[in-house]
Amino acid sequence: MSFHISLLMQQGQAAINAKNFAEAVAFFAQAAKESPKDPQIQACLGQSYCWQGLRAQGLKYLRVSGQLLLKRAKKNRDTRLALDLADQLQYWGDYSGSLDVCKQAVQINPEYVRGYQLLALSHSRLNQKKSALVAGRKALSLAPGSAMLAILLATLEIADGLHEDARKRLEKVLTHPAITPEEKFRAHKELARVLDKLKDFQQVFTHLHAAGEIAPRIPEVAKQDAALVPALLATYQAEFTADLLGRWAQATFPNQQPAPVFLLGFMRTGTTLTQEVLGAHPRVFVADETDLVASVVKELNRISKFQGSVPEQLRQLDFAGVLYLRDFYWQRAKALFGDKMAGRLFLDKTTMNSIDLGVINCLFPDAKLVFLLRDARDVCLSCIMQTMIPTPSTVHLLTWQGTAQFYAQVMTWWLTVKPKLSMEFIEFKYENAVFDFEVAFKPVFSLMGLEWDPAVADFHKNAAGKYIASPSFSQVAQPLYSSSVGRWKHYQADFVEIMPILQPFLDVYSYE
C-alpha cells in the first residue's frame, strides 16, 4: 500500500470515528480508485456507504471485497477474513451475498467450523431449511463440545420439524459444565418452544421463567435502558394533543411521491404476515423493519438543537421544516432501496414505530395507517416465546409480568392517540385474516387505493427463499395456519397472574 493510499485510509478511518460518513466515503472512494483490487479498501468503502444509509451501494462494495478475499484465501486456505466479510453482509441483511461467500469458503477450507456456522445461518434466514440443517450438523461435528453450535442446530431442527431431536439436544446442552449465561438463556428459550410444539405444555413456563431469571446476567441485556420507552410513552400521551396532531392535516404537500402507508402494531400481532400479503400486490413496495422513522426523529432532534421533548419540537417546527423532514425520509428511503421503490406505493412496516405514531401523523397526515390487533393473550405468549435482539423495547419481554405490562403501556398509548389522529387508519384483526382472508384484506387494499388482486393469496410463495427481517420469517413462508389462534388456552393457569393487566384490552376489542 503506497503512502498516499495509506494516508487516505487513515483519513477515512478518522472520518468514521467522527461519524462523518460522507467524508469517509470520499476518502475510501479515492483509495479504491487508486487500488481497486484491495479488499480492505472495498470493505471500508462499503461499510461507510451502509453507515451513511446508502445500503444498496454499500453492499455492492462489500460483495466485491468478499470475492477479493476469497481469491486470496484460495492461495493460503485461510478463510477467516472472507468469513468476517460474510458476517458483515449478514449484519446488513444481505443473506444472499453472505451465502455466496460462505459456500465458497467451506470449499476452500472444509475444516473451519465458522464457515459452516455462517452458512447455516444464511440458509436459515433464506428459509432453506434442509440446507441449513446440513450445514449446522457439519459445524457441530467439527466442534462437538460447543454449546452454542448445539443450540443453533436445535433451532434448525425445530424449523425442520425434528422436535424430539431438538428437545434431547437442548436438555443435554443445559447439563454442559461450562455453559455461559447467554447460552443457558437461549437453551431454555428454545426448549420452551420445542416443548410447546411437542404439546408438553406443563413444562414450557418452567423454562421461560428460568430464561427470564438468567437474562439480567447477559451483558447486552444489562446495558439496555428499560425505563426509556415507558417514559417516552408517558410523555407522548401527555403532550400529543389533537391540535398538534391535526396541525398540518389540511396542508397541501408536493405530490412527486404518494404518501407512505404505515403498518404498525405491537410485536407478534401479525405485521409480518400482513406485509407479505400486501407486498404480494404488484403495485406495493415493502420496507421491512427499517430505521426511516427513527432517523427522522433524530434529525428533528438535531435541527431543534436537542431542546425540549419531541412534541415540543414539533410545535416549534414550521411548514418548511415539515417539508424538509418529509424529504429527509424519502431521500433516506431512496438511499436504502434505490430504483426498486419507484412508481410503487411505499409500505413502511416497522412494527414498533407504533411508539412514534405522533411524529408520523404530524409529518405525514396524508399517509394511511394499518394498525394490527390480535388477542392480547396470544400476543404475550408469542412474545415471551421468542428470542429477540436486546433493545430498550424487547428487554420488557423477558419476563411474564414485564411482557404484559409493556403490552399494556403500548396499547394504552394507541387507545389514547387513536381518537386524535388526523390520518386515515384501519384496525386490522389478525384472527380475521386467518379465518376469512379475502373479506379481511379487501378493506385494507381499499384504504390503500388498490384493487383486490387474487394473487396475493399466494403470498407465501414470494416469502420462501427471501430474507425477512422478523422472527416470523419462517412462518410467513408457508400458507396461513389457524394453530396460532387461541394458543393461550393451553396455558390458562399461567395467565391468571397477568389477566388483570390484559383484561381491559380484551374487553375493548371483544375477545372472549
Describe the role of every protein-language-model region.
Residues 135, 164-178, 187-257, 312-313, ...:
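PAPS-dependent sulfotransferases, especially Golgi type II membrane carbohydrate sulfotransferases
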Residues 254-364, 372:
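Phosphate-binding active sites in nucleotide-utilizing proteins
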Residues 360-384:
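Conserved phosphate-donor/acceptor-positioning beta-strand/loop module used by diverse small-molecule
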